[in-house]
Structure formats: structure tokens, C-alpha cells
């Protein structure tokens, strides 16, 4: 990361104001400004493992990754700079968590793109840290206030759940398909064969719905699930437990923390990172799959039909099949053969 996001560029217009501040950066941290801004001290807290990877290389233990921030994560900070995400419930979870830990009198800055809905920060924080807009540039807004009252934060109150064909799906703010099973995942599930056996890796597992639905019809599969999102990791663990399904769940930037090989890799890969369109994760998934598939193993992914994945699949595996499609989505299948590049 070297290029700054528009939100960071707005903050840099005020860089002189931050030189004496002990800052906690949090929210949608899509660049390394927290590591590079000239401050008295800087910490960062993120729920996104790939953002933590970048920041921790420069900030060490002052960059933290977890679902819920703790008092240690905000220690000695007198200023919060919060990058507004595109998901309002996610912002609510994170801000209530952070403001419950920071001392009264803390300076609060909220910055974000106008299209992300950053304006709603004013209403959200009205009872705790009344905000005023202090800058507007790069289609972003920057808001400032001072913490007057700490909210009471209870992470358990943010859990949600829904049912899919008799399965219980547990969700948290910021998890993909929080309110119900998305159409793409439904299409992918329709292609899975009952009584499948072997080791299955679910990359970008979200709330864990693909894995538990697969396990119900194929109870002998051995499941591993991973996601970059701390809320997704916790939601998947809860979904597995709620349906009495066993599996290993951990945070990983695609394959960064994955060990070993699998008989099948399934995924509904993201193509948005925050407000930005990004095909990086899916391309990393396709290219890296050959290092994590057994001979004869398969990669099966669902994607928006317009996305340019066939070329990457052919380049990596030598061929691919479309095994299901609608007007909007396609399910791609690629098999690990001698033709496949061995990574």
C-alpha cells in the first residue's frame, strides 16, 4: 500500500493538527496512513486481517486485529480517527465498542466517502460525541467532535440469525449475506453433490452457510473455513456450533494462513474491498488454489457473470467448466490435473 485513499488525502490536509496527538486509527483502514502519519503515537485496530497484515509490518504490536477492541488496544490514546465503512451496522458496532473504552474528552474524527453514508455518523454519535463537519474534499466528509459520554457496549446484542432449509445461520455486522442467503451462494449450493467425502476448504466463508449446508448432505467431509473478516470468522464458528457441524475456522488473507492440500475448495469470492471494486482476492484464490489442491481435486466458485475469471482459470488450470448459470451468476469448476500450473 502506498497510494492513499481519498479519505486519507482529506486527513492529510490537517496533518499539522495531529503531530502532538496520540491517535487510535480504526474502521475501514485501506491504506498505511496510520503507519506513516506524523503523530506523538499511533495505534490501529481493525477487523480485517489483510489490513492488519499491512499495518503490523510497520507498526508491530501497535496494530491489532480482533472482533472486539479491548482497553489495551486503545491505551494512552487521546484521539480517535475512524474511517467510515460502507456498512452502517458495522460502523455502529465498532464505534460503540471504541467509545466505550476511550476516556471522556477524547477527540473524535470520522472520515469517509460521501457515497458510503458517512453523514449518518452525526446522528449515530449525537448522544456521545456531537460531530460537526470540518472539511469536505475528494467526495469525502471529515467530522470532528469530543467524547462527552461513553456508551455501554455489549457485543452480544449485535448478533443476528436466520434459517435456511432448517439450518441456523449466525451473523454479525459486516458479514456478507447478513440478512439471508445470497443468490450466488444458492446457485453454488445447488451444484454440490450429496455424500461427497474428503477435505473441503471454504475460502471467504462469511457466516459459514456454504459449509454447514454442504456438511448436512455430506457429513463425512472434513471442513476448514477462512475469511479476512473477524466478524465472519466468529459468525462461522457460531454457525458451525449451532448446527453441530465440526470444522476449523481461522482468519486468513485468501491462502496466507492455510496449510496443506484439499480435495475441494469452494468460494463465493468478494469483488469489493470496502467501497472499491477489487478482483485481487478472487484472482489470488484461483492462482493459489493449485498449491492447495490434491491431484484430482477441484476448485468450485460462483461469481458475477460479467467478471473476467475464465481467462485466469484457463491460464492456471488449463481449462474450466461452467456447471451452472443464471443471468447474473456462473458457477465455475476447475480440476487439478497435470495441465495445471503447480504454483
From Swiss-Prot:
Keyword Methyltransferase: yes
GO molecular-function terms, A-Z: 16S rRNA (guanine(1207)-N(2))-methyltransferase activity; nucleic acid binding
UniProt xrefs under Pfam families: MTS (PF05175), MTS_N (PF08468)
Catalytic activity from the UniProt record: guanosine(1207) in 16S rRNA + S-adenosyl-L-methionine = N(2)-methylguanosine(1207) in 16S rRNA + S-adenosyl-L-homocysteine + H(+)
Predominant location category: cytoplasm
Keyword Iron: no
Keywords: Cytoplasm, Methyltransferase, rRNA processing, S-adenosyl-L-methionine, Transferase
One GO CC term on file: cytoplasm
The enzyme's E.C. designation: 2.1.1.172
Subcellular location: Cytoplasm
Domain of life: Bacteria
Quaternary structure annotation from Swiss-Prot or TrEMBL: Monomer.
Role summary: Specifically methylates the guanine in position 1207 of 16S rRNA in the 30S particle.
Recorded family membership: Belongs to the methyltransferase superfamily. RsmC family.
The protein's name in its UniProt record: Ribosomal RNA small subunit methyltransferase C
Organism: Escherichia coli O6:H1 (strain CFT073 / ATCC 700928 / UPEC)
